Curated annotation (Swiss-Prot):
Catalytically driven reaction(s): (S)-2,3,4,5-tetrahydrodipicolinate + succinyl-CoA + H2O = (S)-2-succinylamino-6-oxoheptanedioate + CoA
GO biological process, one term: lysine biosynthetic process via diaminopimelate
Source organism: Sinorhizobium fredii (strain NBRC 101917 / NGR234)
CDD domains reported for this sequence: LbH_THP_succinylT
Predominant subcellular localization, coarse grouping: cytoplasm
Gene name of the record: dapD
Name of the featured protein: 2,3,4,5-tetrahydropyridine-2,6-dicarboxylate N-succinyltransferase
Intracellular or extracellular location(s): Cytoplasm
Length: 285
């Protein structure tokens, strides 16, 4: 699809979204065709909700988020096959694997272990491995990435190459508010078991999050070496663990208020060290 075609497609979707109250399951023609085309492009990985520039800046293609939102208005509730014992679900979004045969799976080149759930319009790159996990619509999972058991990749989340999302990890989805960016895990990151990264936060390339690290937009990210406090983004090649810091407040009884949770950057490593050092060794203090 040419840039001109994409521009035309995005304009149709932008216009439809402005008058979205008029869009329904009975809508036909250009709007439905445009939304279907956008979902197919997302599903095939030919377009992404967010793209990384050469300078590291992520640009969000808001029109693709709007296409996903419009699809909820266009599609009726229907039976979705694939439940245990031939049971069914009731939803507006089909499985990515609906109608797939051996040929489609071989062409896609990733592993989909029984009981993983991937909704249509999510892209899974070759050599990725999906354990019993959940990947929501509009998400992107990069080449060679492992999505471990009970991990969740939220709507429109962007997961890079050679990432390991450990068991029970939650990567938050962001469809609304419209201006919000998606949650992003860049290439070669390791996210420890039961950790959560949400609300459009970014974990930059090569970073390691220990088990049980929770990062949202309001979470303090403290560099232990410098004392610097930042929000919303983990710098490249950071090793991060869960911690706490003084709240700076005093309770009514005169005692110091409890410490508050934070994420602590315990060290930073270069690319060479990161590639040669085991995860457990990096996390040892």
């Amino acid at each position: 699809m040419t840039n001109h075609d994409l521009a035309s497609l995005s304009q149709t979707i932008e216009t439809a979204f402005e008058d979205r109250e008029a869009v329904s399951t009975s809508t036909r023609g250009a709007i439905r065709d445009a939304v279907e085309a956008a979902l197919n492009l997302l599903d095939s990985g030919k377009v992404r909700v967010a793209e990384r520039g050469a300078d590291g800046t992520w640009t969000v293609n808001q029109w693709l988020k709007k296409a996903v939102l419009l699809s909820f208005r266009l599609n009726p509730m229907e039976l979705v096959k694939g439940g245990p014992g031939e049971s069914v679900w009731w939803d507006k979004v089909a499985s990515k694997f609906d109608g797939w045969s051996v040929n489609e799976f071989e062409k896609a080149g990733f592993r989909a272990v029984p009981n993983c759930v991937v909704r249509r319009s999510a892209y899974i790159a070759p050599n990725a491995i999906l354990m019993p996990s959940f990947v929501n619509l509009g998400a992107y999972v990069g080449e060679g990435t492992m999505v471990d058991t009970w991990a969740t990749v939220g709507s429109c989340a962007q997961i890079g190459k050679n990432v390991h999302l450990s068991g029970g990890v939650g990567i938050g989805g962001v469809l609304e508010p419209m201006q919000a960016g998606p949650t992003i895990i860049e290439d070669n990151c390791f996210i420890g078991a039961r950790s959560e990264v949400v609300e459009g936060c970014i974990v930059r390339e090569g970073s390691v999050l220990g088990m049980g690290v929770f990062i949202g937009k309001s979470t303090k990210i403290v560099d232990r070496a410098t004392g610097e406090v930042t929000y919303g983004e983990v710098p490249p090649y950071s090793v991060v663990v869960a911690g706490s810091m003084p709240s700076g407040s005093t309770m009514a009884n005169g005692q110091p208020a409890p410490n508050l949770y934070c994420a602590v950057i315990v060290k930073r490593v270069d690319e060479k060290t990161r590639s040669k050092t085991g995860i457990n060794e990096l996390l040892r203090d």
